[in-house]
């Protein structure tokens, strides 16, 4: 047995038992004390490098904080908060239509910042008062391109507070691949240039909130990390809590000090299209309809269906959202809801010309830099709105249509100094999109007939 032990050697460095002080045996392998010391040195070096990187990141963050920053805007007071009618008037300058939604938003935003002014830093609220004012987050329901994000952004600009947009489809429950809900607060903090106090008075718009609905009303057996799991993770943030926000993102930089943000003063606005929610409401109201629509009336019926859907959504109840896939706890933290109308052709025409930053005005400004005066005939504006309405993507389709229309013009005009004026006609719009847009199915049926 002693003769057999004399041939033992380290499985890593190959040294025999006589050449080392200690040889530790494992299942089929051996390691000497020298290799163990070497492994410990490697681990210590990696730990030191990781801590040094973390200290460097903290130093960069502290240098950014030490850099001169814009002075924080003063907290709102009851005298400086715009009244609901003033808020709606400002929204009218930027957003066409949606009067009911504007009214709901104006009152909700006014009450929210009036609550912040009432609480203040603790000195504004009377000590004898036992009344605590809780915030009311907002839910916007409307089809794509109807102005949900623009409304929230315009509100933030008017109130002069930081504004951040988050996409609910990228969020996952903590511990899974995707973004943590704390990253939403990190974006708001970045918009506030690292000013925590200013960020705590900001507005966060969470888009595509309907995409985190669970697949069925009944609790799932398997874990839904991007649906119900995200709703559960958002509960405390929506209600109000002190969240720990990693300034460099929590997953790639574990060695960093977190910044604490109180979300009780942040206004959350959630928006989504909620496709199929009108069917849920109609089933509750017992208004199901089954039938076939002739091809020649399909376009008119489609427009009528959009209008009917918006009217049905006005009968929305919390139980309908539960059946759609939102958990009751989540719905309870968004008590204010507003339904946005789908945009018709008249609204799209107004969007092209009326707002302060209307698309027609934007392209006129672009060409004026080349000393060219651009004009849109009313018939051309109507044709652009008609094409955008046919695409069913709301106001977002308008820019794509005009970009296609203006491509050759913006390519040639800078090199043609003799051109001083250009007029967009209806014929030019039809010619531009006649070969690029598929005809409506009803027209195909008429041609085949």
Curated annotation (Swiss-Prot):
HAMAP family: ClpX
Protein purpose: ATP-dependent specificity component of the Clp protease. It directs the protease to specific substrates. Can perform chaperone functions in the absence of ClpP.
UniProt keyword Nucleotide-binding present: yes
Family per similarity comment: Belongs to the ClpX chaperone family.
Annotated PROSITE patterns: CLPX_ZB (PS51902)
PANTHER family: ATP-DEPENDENT CLP PROTEASE ATP-BINDING SUBUNIT CLPX-LIKE, MITOCHONDRIAL, ATP-DEPENDENT CLP PROTEASE ATP-BINDING SUBUNIT CLPX-LIKE, MITOCHONDRIAL-RELATED
CDD domains documented for this protein: RecA-like_ClpX
Highest taxon, organism lineage: Bacteria
Source species: Synechococcus sp. (strain RCC307)
Any GO MF annotation of the entry: ATP hydrolysis activity
List of residues binding Zn(2+): 10, 13, 32, 35
List of residues binding ATP: 143-150
SUPFAM superfamilies: Glucocorticoid receptor-like (DNA-binding domain), P-loop containing nucleoside triphosphate hydrolases
Cited Gene3D superfamilies: 1.10.8.60, ClpX chaperone, C4-type zinc finger domain (6.20.220.10), P-loop containing nucleotide triphosphate hydrolases (3.40.50.300)
Lineage, top ranks: Bacteria, Bacillati, Cyanobacteriota, Cyanophyceae, Synechococcales
NCBIfam families: clpX (TIGR00382), PRK05342.1 (NF003745)
Domain (ClpX-type ZB): residue spans on this chain: 1-51
A Pfam family recorded for this sequence: AAA_2
GO BP of this protein: cell division; proteolysis involved in protein catabolic process
Region called Disordered, residue ranges: 53-79
Name this protein carries in UniProt: ATP-dependent Clp protease ATP-binding subunit ClpX
């Amino acid at each position: 047995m002693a003769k057999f032990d004399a041939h033992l050697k380290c499985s890593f460095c190959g040294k025999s038992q006589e050449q080392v002080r200690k040889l530790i045996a494992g299942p089929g392998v051996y390691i000497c004390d020298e290799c163990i010391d070497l492994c410990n040195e490697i681990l210590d070096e990696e730990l030191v490098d990781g801590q040094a990187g973390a200290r460097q990141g903290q130093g960069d963050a502290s240098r950014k904080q030490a850099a001169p920053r814009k002075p924080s805007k003063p907290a709102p007071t009851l005298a400086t908060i715009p009244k609901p009618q003033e808020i709606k008037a400002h929204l009218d300058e930027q957003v066409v239509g949606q009067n009911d939604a504007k009214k709901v938003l104006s009152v909700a935003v006014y009450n929210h910042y009036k609550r912040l002014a009432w609480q203040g830093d603790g000195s504004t609220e009377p000590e004898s008062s036992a009344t605590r004012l809780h915030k009311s987050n907002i839910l916007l329901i409307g089809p794509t391109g109807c102005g949900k994000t623009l409304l929230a952004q315009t509100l933030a600009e008017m109130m002069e507070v930081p504004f951040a947009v988050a996409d609910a489809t990228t969020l996952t429950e903590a511990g899974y691949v995707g973004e943590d809900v704390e990253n939403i607060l990190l974006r708001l903090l970045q918009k506030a240039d690292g000013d925590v106090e200013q960020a705590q008075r900001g507005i966060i718009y969470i888009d595509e909130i309907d995409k985190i609905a669970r697949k069925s009303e009944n609790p799932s057996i398997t874990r839904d990390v991007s649906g119900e799991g995200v709703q559960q993770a958002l509960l405390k943030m929506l209600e109000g809590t002190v969240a720990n926000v990693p300034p460099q993102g929590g997953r790639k930089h574990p060695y960093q000090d977190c910044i604490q943000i109180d979300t009780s003063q942040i206004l959350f606005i959630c928006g989504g299209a909620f496709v199929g929610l009108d069917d849920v409401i109609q089933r509750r109201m017992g208004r199901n309809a089954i039938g076939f629509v002739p091809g020649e009336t399909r376009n008119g019926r489609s427009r009528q269906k959009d209008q009917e859907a918006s009217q049905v959504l006005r009968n929305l109840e919390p139980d309908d959202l539960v059946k759609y896939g939102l958990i009751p706890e989540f719905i309870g933290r968004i008590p204010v809801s507003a339904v946005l109308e789908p945009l018709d052709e008249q609204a799209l025409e107004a969007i092209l010309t009326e707002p302060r930053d209307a698309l027609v005005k934007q392209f006129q400004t672009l060409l004026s830099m080349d000393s060219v005066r651009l004009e849109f005939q009313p018939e051309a504006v109507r044709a652009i709105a008609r094409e955008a309405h046919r695409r069913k993507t709301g106001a977002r389709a308008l820019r794509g249509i005009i970009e296609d229309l203006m491509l050759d013009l913006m390519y040639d005009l800078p090199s043609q100094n003799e051109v001083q004026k250009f007029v967009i006609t209806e014929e030019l719009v039809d010619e531009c999109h006649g070969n690029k847009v598929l005809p409506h199915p009803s027209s195909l049926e008429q041609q085949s007939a």
